[in-house]
């Protein structure tokens, strides 16, 4: 039977991505890759570790994607493109930094984040597992109340930590974070996988930068 990519996408979005609910690794292909504007590429294990560390749904238990416009790609029938306009209220203590950094747990402020419209896509295997997830591509930075930031960075802005969102845009800072995750504390969220740890299919389409 042909895969209903719209139904599959709607299911994964709300039950498996690690942003709105805990990660469900069983719905991700072994050759899974995640890509966002400043985060990624992340392979399956690094993505699971990162989202398990961030636990956005803990600090924002009512976070919802408010997704719309689910469309099967006419050229790639196993790909679904859609948009989100997420909302969520910061009502619970949140530690997105890593379990060894419990002292940095952020206390809730009761503010509701209204994120701008973001474009996402999911590409599946014929068996119905997600092979490629793209996320957080903001359509208009003048929407919402998170200073134009989307995805996790928007939640930092809403938590009165806009400086964290700004710092995360710095490639050098992300590189330091990756070194810490690799060498000091594996619970720290990675922003990119080591090139050699990415699936062959992804390395073929986006080769690592020359050293």
Task: Walk through the language-model features, giving the residues of each.
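C-terminal and inter-domain tail/linker signature
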Residues: 1-211
């Amino acid at each position: 039977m042909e895969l209903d990519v719209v139904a599959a996408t709607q299911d994964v979005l709300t039950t498996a991505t690690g942003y709105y609910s805990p990660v469900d690794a069983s719905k991700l292909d072994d050759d899974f890759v995640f890509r966002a504007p400043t985060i990624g590429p992340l392979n399956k294990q690094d993505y699971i570790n990162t989202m398990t560390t961030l636990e956005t749904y803990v600090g924002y238990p009512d976070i919802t994607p408010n997704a719309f416009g689910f469309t099967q790609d006419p050229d790639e029938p196993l790909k679904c493109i859609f948009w989100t306009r997420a909302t969520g209220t910061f009502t619970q203590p949140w530690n997105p930094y890593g379990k060894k950094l419990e002292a940095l747990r952020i206390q809730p402020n009761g503010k509701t984040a209204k994120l701008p419209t973001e474009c996402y896509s999911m590409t599946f295997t014929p068996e119905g597992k997600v092979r490629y997830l793209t996320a957080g591509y903001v359509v208009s930075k003048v929407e919402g109340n998170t200073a134009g930031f989307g995805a996790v960075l928007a939640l930092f802005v809403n938590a009165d930590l806009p400086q964290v969102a700004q710092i995360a845009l710095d490639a050098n800072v992300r590189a330091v974070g990756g070194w810490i995750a690799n060498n000091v504390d594996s619970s720290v969220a990675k922003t990119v996988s080591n090139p050699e740890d990415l699936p062959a299919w992804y390395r073929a389409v986006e080769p690592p930068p020359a050293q």
